[in-house]
């Protein structure tokens, strides 16, 4: 069963020690685990307008999901997700994590709209966004942009 747990520093290190770039987006940046980078990344995500969660399957961290750019006056935020590697993809885990994040954003944080983006070539990510209720609002040379409103989210 997939659960979301607030990510702490130790969980962040455990996740990124095993993280592998998705081949669909890996050409944008090369990732190598570095403890100093993981500490800085964790610290950057400890600000007021962000919430960082570990995606946990049977006690194992298989991804991270975050809400960022939270605007409590406009009731909007952005959602992002990273899964550990290809071994945990195409099994419904990302879909379930995004459903849980949307539910948290809409029901617990009183958001009206959640935005997201996906690299144009990352067809899996784009499919999952649409599956959980997002619709495409535009594209640029690199990304497709999406939004999900409370009434059409899962």
Model-identified regions with their sequence ranges:
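Acyl-donor (CoA/ACP) binding surface of acyl/acetyltransferases
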Residues: 1-14, 18-22, 49-52, 56-154
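Conserved GNAT-fold acetyl-CoA-binding loop/helix
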Residues: 23-42
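Short loop/turn motifs at secondary-structure junctions and domain boundaries
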Residues: 43-49
